[in-house]
Amino acid sequence: MFDNKFKISSKFKPDGDQPRAIKQLTAGLKAGQKFQTLLGVTGSGKTFTMANVIENVQKPTLVIAPNKTLAAQLAQEFRTFFPKSAVEYFVSYYDYYQPEAYISSTDTYIEKESQINDEIDRLRHAATVAVMSRQDVVIVASVSCIYGLGSPEFYEEISLSLKIGEAVDREKLIKDLTEMHFLRSEYLSRGKFRAHGETIEIMSPSREIVTRIEIKEDKIKKISEYNFLTGEALGNLEKVLIYPAKHFVVPEPVLEEALNQIEKELNERVAYFKKNKKLLEAERIYRRTKQDLEMMREIGYCNGIENYSRYLTGRAPGEAPYTLVDYFSKDFLIVVDESHVTVPQLNGMYNGDHARKKALIDNGFRLPSAYDNRPMKFSEFEKKINQVIFTSATPGKYEIEKSSCRPHPNPPLIKGREA
């Protein structure tokens, strides 16, 4: 893991109320306070204040904003302050999204339709790679960061470490890349690889860079990189760590057990529908789930695979999903920006998702375990908090109670408490 340090680059120095705010927030974090609130209107320099606090405490940081636009703005500001650190942007990658749904009153099934933004998908992968590989990282995210993402343990376990001089079997390397959901193709793009003789070229899902592995006599002879767009050589490497092409990755033994568990639940669900004389629903769930199982056995993936995430991540029924939060080390900082808007959003996401899933499950479109493909409940999010700073000009009731914070006419004022 990179052990770089946060170091602010700015011609400005803290001014006005900022030095006091920075000092108080830093002291609170170092004293172990769990909740703090920074009061400040837009334009009062909250981002610069927070950048100074992050530099002081040197903690990996997740900044949660209420929407994509504000998240993009904050990411750009933090990149300006931390040009040598990893500042990444993590938001929903859908340009268009129509969730799967069933309207019982009109007997209408609406299939999921979506259009994924390729660049945002790249940025999401860049974010998880950065969190896994370095300490000096700020991820600026929208509230979609509390949706299920796949197991960070499997994501790291299934990654591929290669180094010069290491023994390697070409066919096994190709098989490993396929299990990591890289697609073999003559034409490279993100998440694809190609193999010509003893040379294998891999394009990461997080960068527009190609890693070339050259093999001679069953050993890695050379590792190099080049820019995919320009062809410019970027130099040779002693070793490289390649992360999976998708976030939902599962080791083979876990996948086999998951498929068995899905099959078992399917049989129980079919029996339930038949017992209740719901033959259409029984046929519907049987046909659909069997198709998904066949796809997962063949290629390790299927459309809507997230609906089986409980089994694929080894969770118990009702257990909180893995999200971006779980990719951070335990000692990390959360900053909730515009918390008077963001906290209610975090609080309300679970209920709407549950109501939509209920109609699908009751009518045989999904297995009951699909309930566990969901955003975190707010109570689950609270348990994941190590330390958090809320920022707002008008903090809500939650922030005020948790931080013992009182609004003040001369922001910023900070108060905090341990729990």
What is the role of each PLM region?
Residues M1-C405, A419:
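ASCE RecA-like P-loop NTPase motor cores
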